[in-house]
């Protein structure tokens, strides 16, 4: 359709003479293959659904602005943080994790919290969740997590048995499971939850000094959550309640905000840390590593087209900028390949050209001249006729050695190390988290756990009770009571290796 006169055309500009009536042989005859407009439309329709994300398929997004409110240049020379008051355009996408594109927003689930900052040194993607930890610490388990929380291959239904069988087979998962079964496992909406980078990352400054960091984003709207009963009533009326809440707030000028903080750990502190500081199943205690304010982001513009900006948004932890870097966190290392690879499958090799993914602070003519061709390459004239190799006699495409990162500390031989032999302290932190809850909040953890374990076999329930008891005896007793299981009939002293190996 021509935007100027509102007249309908086909995809290549030819006027459409009749939008409603197909071309036929006679008034009531069969269709003619020369009705090219119909063929063009139906063939496009047949192909317009792209693969959904393997996780985080149901999501909402908005554009906004990040503003620096505190000087952290002692830790990083990243330009996004170069001065107080500096603003950077950004995009955020929130999501559930387990459900498909049409799933309800209010499920007891982790929420995705993905941010894309359009800096002058390129895009910085911080791909996190609304929880500071995860179920495990080795990426080889990620595929099984996907299988366990999604649909059963025989019934094609989600299976609490599969879910809990997997979770309770990993004692280190209890920390994340405790958060998930707590009030924060059912946020009222995306505006009313905190966000976390979750992984350990690093920063480095002009002197080449590296520190390890964790990112925190604290909602300025306040934490609000639903009970299972409240959520069930809302889902019956509105499956898109979190998306609607975010969209309507922005449309009405009630712009949501989050304050950004970091925790900082020096390399020397990391060497002496009692646990593995790169273990995604654990937090750094704030009393030891206090929150340092960095800035605030505000979401103030809804996308004009959901598919263009939200469905096609592509986040990858490999998208970082000078002054920011990775860590030895094995889960982060595993994501460095997986995310970009998934986007290339889902959106194509040139998905960086999609407007929401384009670097805004770097001219497209300067972007990687050796990555050419591929389906739907159009944005930068495919780098024109310039050299597509290096070295060349034109003196272009030179490296930028001033952006070399400081040496990345590593040690040891390449080997499949058993991480359980490195650290089997699975229950200290979930126990502390449980004891921080009010008595009412503890009761809701028990109730939520019983609801979530409905239909799960007794042996799996017993395994979970045993883990909870090891975190705190009252935790185990409360879950057992909610599940109507006599805790006195359970062997609570089974060691962890046996628990993991035998699932008993």
From Swiss-Prot:
It holds the Pfam family Catalase. InterPro entries: Catalase, Catalase_3, Catalase_AS, Catalase_clade1/3, Catalase_core, Catalase_haem_BS, Catalase_immune_responsive, Catalase_sf. The gene is katA. PANTHER family: CATALASE. GO terms for cellular component: cytoplasm. It catalyses: 2 H2O2 = O2 + 2 H2O. The lineage of its organism: Bacteria, Bacillati, Bacillota, Bacilli, Bacillales. It is an enzyme of class 1 (oxidoreductase). It comes from Staphylococcus epidermidis. Its EC number is 1.11.1.6. GO terms for biological process: hydrogen peroxide catabolic process; response to hydrogen peroxide. The keyword Protein transport does not apply. One of its GO terms (molecular function) is metal ion binding. This is Catalase. Disulfide bonds: none annotated. Keywords: Heme, Hydrogen peroxide, Iron, Metal-binding, Oxidoreductase, Peroxidase. Coiled coil: none annotated. Heme binds at residue 339. Homodimer. Belongs to the catalase family. The active site is at residues 56, 129. Its cofactor is heme. The keyword Oxidoreductase applies. It comes from the Bacteria. Decomposes hydrogen peroxide into water and oxygen; serves to protect cells from the toxic effects of hydrogen peroxide.
């Amino acid at each position: 359709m021509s935007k100027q006169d509102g007249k309908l055309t086909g995809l290549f500009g030819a006027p459409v003479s009749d939008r409603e009536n197909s071309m036929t042989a006679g008034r009531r005859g069969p269709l003619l293959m020369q009705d090219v407009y119909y063929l063009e439309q139906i063939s496009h329709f047949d192909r317009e659904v792209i693969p959904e994300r393997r996780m985080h398929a149901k999501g909402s997004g908005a554009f906004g602005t990040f503003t620096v409110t505190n000087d952290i240049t002692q830790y990083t020379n990243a330009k996004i943080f170069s001065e107080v008051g500096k603003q950077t355009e950004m995009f955020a996408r929130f999501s559930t994790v387990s459900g498909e594109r049409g799933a309800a927003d209010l499920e007891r689930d982790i929420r995705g919290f993905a941010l894309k900052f359009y800096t002058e040194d390129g895009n910085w993607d911080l791909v996190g969740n609304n929880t500071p930890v995860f179920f495990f610490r080795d990426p080889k388990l990620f595929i099984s997590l996907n299988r366990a929380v999604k649909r059963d291959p025989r019934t094609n239904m989600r299976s609490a048995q599969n879910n809990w069988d997997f979770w309770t087979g990993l004692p280190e998962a209890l920390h994340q499971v405790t958060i998930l079964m707590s009030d924060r496992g059912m946020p009222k909406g995306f505006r009313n939850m905190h966000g976390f980078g979750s992984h350990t990352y690093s920063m480095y400054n002009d002197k080449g000094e590296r520190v390890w960091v964790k990112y925190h984003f604290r909602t300025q709207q306040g934490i609000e959550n639903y009970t299972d009963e409240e959520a069930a009533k809302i889902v019956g009326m509105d499956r898109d309640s979190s998306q609607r809440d975010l969209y309507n707030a922005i449309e009405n000028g009630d712009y949501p905000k989050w304050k950004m903080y970091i925790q900082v750990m020096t390399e020397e502190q990391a060497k002496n840390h009692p646990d593995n500081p790169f273990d995604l199943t654990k937090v750094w205690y704030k009393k030891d590593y206090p929150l340092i304010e960095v800035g605030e982001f505000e979401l103030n513009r809804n996308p004009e087209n959901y598919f263009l900006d939200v469905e096609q948004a592509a986040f990858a932890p490999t998208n970082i900028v000078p002054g920011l870097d990775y860590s030895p966190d094995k889960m982060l290392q595993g994501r460095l390949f997986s995310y970009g690879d998934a986007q290339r499958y889902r959106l194509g090799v040139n998905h960086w050209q999609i407007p929401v993914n384009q670097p805004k602070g770097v001219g497209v003519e300067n972007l990687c001249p050796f990555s050419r061709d591929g389906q739907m390459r159009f944005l930068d004239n495919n780098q024109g006729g310039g050299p597509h190799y290096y070295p060349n006699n034109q003196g272009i495409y030179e490296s930028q050695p001033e952006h070399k990162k400081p040496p990345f500390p590593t040690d040891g031989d390449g080997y499949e190390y058993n991480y359980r032999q490195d650290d089997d302290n699975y229950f200290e932190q979930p126990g502390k988290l449980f004891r921080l809850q009010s008595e009412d909040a503890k009761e809701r953890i028990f109730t939520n756990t019983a609801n979530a374990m409905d239909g799960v076999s007794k042996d799996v329930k017993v395994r979970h009770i045993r883990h909870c008891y090891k975190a705190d005896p009252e935790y185990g007793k409360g879950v057992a009571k909610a599940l109507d299981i006599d805790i006195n009939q359970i062997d609570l002293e089974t060691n962890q290796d046996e628990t993991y190996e035998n699932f008993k």
